[in-house]
Amino acid sequence: MKWSEVFHDITTRHDFQAMHDFLEKEYTTQIVYPDKKNIYQAFDLTPFEDIKVVILGQDPYHGPNQAHGLAFSVQPHAKFPPSLRNMYQELENDIGCHRTSPHLQDWAREGVLLLNTVLTVRQGEAHSHRNIGWETFTDEIIQAVSNYREHVVFILWGRPAQQKERFIDTSKHLIIKSPHPSPLSAFRGFFGSKPYSTTNNYLKSKGKTPVQWCES
């Protein structure tokens, strides 16, 4: 199965015209992130048949030169967001690799679907595009990955992500849960949770190639 088939299935069962119209107006009259051409970049960089890991975020970063369509990732020369810095600290503690770029395209190309549950946001207004239809779309994406792929690791950081557990078949996938890597919660159990090594150990146990989390 390919993303085109997944999207066709979703759009035949749900009407996204109101969301489409809303976004057309928003992109015309407001500053919206990411750039329109990057809204679906997570799907462009991670083919459906290559998915090994899903990391769920919430909505895109709402500052300039940050969001580019991948959850938690920012553009190459942007300042490190605090959550990403904590993700990298845990990466170093977990498997000993030090990353210097805030850009996660290499993870996406390794089969890590970096999926926000809302794919657009107005500049400076966090959560401004909630409840326009994105949640329906991304819930269906999670369900499709669960239904049609085997032995995927779903990494759910924080309560909003963990509410999506109901869409995942735990008999054939691994779910890794911990507090969110944001500074507000990282010390409540994110640090020390070892999501990267746990993911790779599971993938290897299923005969899959582990993720190259470190910069090559």
Curated annotation (Swiss-Prot):
EC number: 3.2.2.27
UniProt xrefs under InterPro entries: UDG_fam1, Ura-DNA_Glyclase_AS, Uracil-DNA_glycosylase-like, Uracil-DNA_glycosylase-like_sf
Keyword match tRNA processing: no
Gene Ontology BP, a term: base-excision repair, AP site formation via deaminated base removal
Subcellular compartments: Cytoplasm
SMART domains: UDG (SM00986), UreE_C (SM00987)
Molecular function (Gene Ontology), one example: uracil DNA N-glycosylase activity
Superkingdom of origin organism: Bacteria
Biological role stated in the UniProt entry: Excises uracil residues from the DNA which can arise as a result of misincorporation of dUMP residues by DNA polymerase or due to deamination of cytosine.
Enzyme class, spelled out: hydrolase
PROSITE patterns per UniProt: U_DNA_GLYCOSYLASE
Keyword Cytoplasm: yes
NCBIfam families: PRK05254.1-1, PRK05254.1-2, PRK05254.1-4, PRK05254.1-5, ung
GO cellular component: cytoplasm
SUPFAM superfamilies, alphabetized: Uracil-DNA glycosylase-like (SSF52141)
Record family assignment: Belongs to the uracil-DNA glycosylase (UDG) superfamily. UNG family.
Organism the protein comes from: Staphylococcus epidermidis (strain ATCC 35984 / DSM 28319 / BCRC 17069 / CCUG 31568 / BM 3577 / RP62A)
Catalytic function, reaction form: Hydrolyzes single-stranded DNA or mismatched double-stranded DNA and polynucleotides, releasing free uracil
Gene: ung
Name of the protein in its database record: Uracil-DNA glycosylase
Keyword terms, alphabetized: Cytoplasm, DNA damage, DNA repair, Hydrolase
PANTHER family for this protein: URACIL-DNA GLYCOSYLASE
Active site: D59 (proton acceptor)
